[in-house]
A protein has these predicted regions:
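Cell-envelope/glycan interface and biosynthesis
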Residues: 1-122
Length: 123
């Protein structure tokens, strides 16, 4: 886990807090990728940003649980409600604004762009 990634995640958490949500991010395995999930803290504020059931203390509805490697969690998985599709796209966009790419295996799996030994050494 590099400092740039942690700093970016901290900025994302601050942005989400202002929108009535909280970020949970854990380094996921030796690849340095991140498992990301978003929890609703204030449903009224969150309703201006995301869709679906927004009960305080519950995760934003992404169609499958975070951290569970299911075929339905893949980025290309179909058959979800418009709310779930919207929320997944919203999360991809939010993370991309902070230089994280969504890995194709799961909506909750992200890697920081330009991370790795070469980029870290170049800084």
């Amino acid at each position: 886990q590099d400092r740039a990634g942690q700093a970016a995640l901290s900025r994302i958490a601050q942005q989400l807090q202002a929108q009535g949500m909280a970020l949970k991010a854990r380094c996921h395995g030796p690849s340095g990728a991140w498992r990301v999930e978003v929890t609703v803290v204030d449903g009224l504020k969150a309703s201006k940003v995301v869709r679906g059931p927004l009960a305080d203390g519950h995760e934003v509805d992404m169609g499958t649980p975070a951290g569970v490697p299911l075929a339905a969690a893949s980025v290309d998985a179909g058959g979800f409600s418009p709310d779930v599709q919207f929320n997944r796209q919203w999360l991809r966009t939010l993370m991309a604004q902070h230089r994280f790419s969504n890995l194709p295996d799961a909506w909750w799996h992200f890697a920081q762009q330009g991370s790795g030994p070469v980029s870290v050494a170049a800084r």
